[in-house]
Amino acid sequence: MAYLKTDVLLLSDIFENFRKVCMNYYKLDPANYLSAPSLAWDAMLLLTNIELELITDLKMLNLVENMKRGGLCFVGSKRYVKANNKYMQEYNPNETSNYVMYWDANNLYGWAMSQNLPYKDLKFETDVSLDQILNTSDDNETGYFIECDLHFPEEIHEKLKEYPPCPENILPKLEWFSEYQKTVGKITGSIRANEKYSATPKLIPHLMDHKNYVIHYRNLKFIKDLGVEIKKVHNVISFSQKNWLAEYINFNTEKRKQASNDFEKDFFKLMNNAVFGKTMENVKNRINLHLTTDDNNAKKW
């Protein structure tokens, strides 16, 4: 009994402190929210005072939704590497000196959300040329989403093969599998004797042609510089853009620097990252849920 009482009291103290932090910095009470993303989203709207235009055109919405593909959890095809340099006990001077380095991007989500982002005036364009789009600066007041066909020439395959740009959610075909993959598939039973298997869409970086690929104009400029060819443009969406989210991101970043305990350090990081997740939310999965103890309401709903 004493344990339960202590546990409840400690948790209540922690939650009350959490409420004080939120109300002090954001003027919002987390007790009114079901999740951290919904709290963070309202905090962002309150602090930035931004008015975001909603997309009402179904075709436009589907094109924008197609740009949400997920994230890769690997870079390159090498599964094993071994360093060999003068700082190692097992250094072999007769072999090539090399190093293994671990890279991590600081404030990855925060940096992305501090860039110019769409916020109003989304519309389909018919008079904007590809050259105009490719010559649009990153900080221009107008930005673009482009639906296009892409081709990766053979001469750039060697350069890009370890980390191909523009991954796609596609069904992998059996003929793409290596002999090793086929062997493992047969052993595990995922590939049957008649060489049929249950394919599910995967996020795959590849250097084959991309059809109807929807991409942000800054990424399009980047891959064009890598040597990727833009074969056809199907649709162009223009929008007004500015770094409207940067104020909120910078606020949390500064508060995290000033934090004197682990809770606040993690809290201000979460308040940034949770907003990113909220921008990726699939609202099509939402449902209206009613709780009632009234028979008439139950029949009505």
Predicted regions and their residues:
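Conserved acidic
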Residues: 1-301
